[in-house]
Amino acid sequence: MQHITGLAPFRHLELCVGPGVFVPRPETEMLAGLAIDAATTLVQEGVHEPLVVDLCTGSAAIALAIATEVPQARVIAVELSCDAAQWAECNITSMAAQVELRRGDATAEAVTGDLDGIVDIVVSNPPYIPPDAIPIDPEVAEHDPAMALYGLGDDGLAIPTAVAWRASDLLRPGGLFLMEHADVQGKAIVDVLLGQQSWVKVHDQNDDAGRPRHVVATRATSGESS
């Protein structure tokens, strides 16, 4: 339906969507909620301007939800696709939201290297579908861009793994990483993060349907290990 109306509800927002951008799904609202709760906690603890980075932002759904629900936060969104970035820019402008949009590879130091080691929260809904999987939802299969769907590699985890590496550089010690994945990838993505040896408190959280959907990890401090 969103592809017909050009509008997609997301938490309290109504986003403009169209050709070339992934339409956000309900499970991603939960991911945004985790980031919002974490940013809110930081504000309550006295952090003046929590720094949140949304990698692979697409329509800017997560970034906008955070910026509008935690106005004290500084939110930076990164998107590689020119088409998706145009939709993100349109949504940010229409809502007059305080979100900085950066165009480029979310896994590249050249795009966000100035933020290394100072970010409080990194959140991402990257492409993660395995190459041989066909999306069950026909709207996804027929309308959403392949670039936003398929995570590359034999298991679809090549891009999520690269995002996790980038997040480990961006986050300050003790910073929080949140990332969506396919329900069949729960154990695999946890193993990936444990193998990177940059994370502690690595665990997976289920979506509202009880399926593994979001990996959560804390950037290790010096001397900590997973």
Each predicted region: which residue ranges?
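SAM-dependent Rossmann-like transferase core, predominantly class I methyltransferases
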Residues: M1-P71, V75-W87, R103, V216
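Intrinsically disordered, low-complexity terminal tails and inter-domain linkers enriched
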Residues: T41-H48, G113-L115, E224-S225
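S-adenosylmethionine
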Residues: Q72-R74, V78-E224
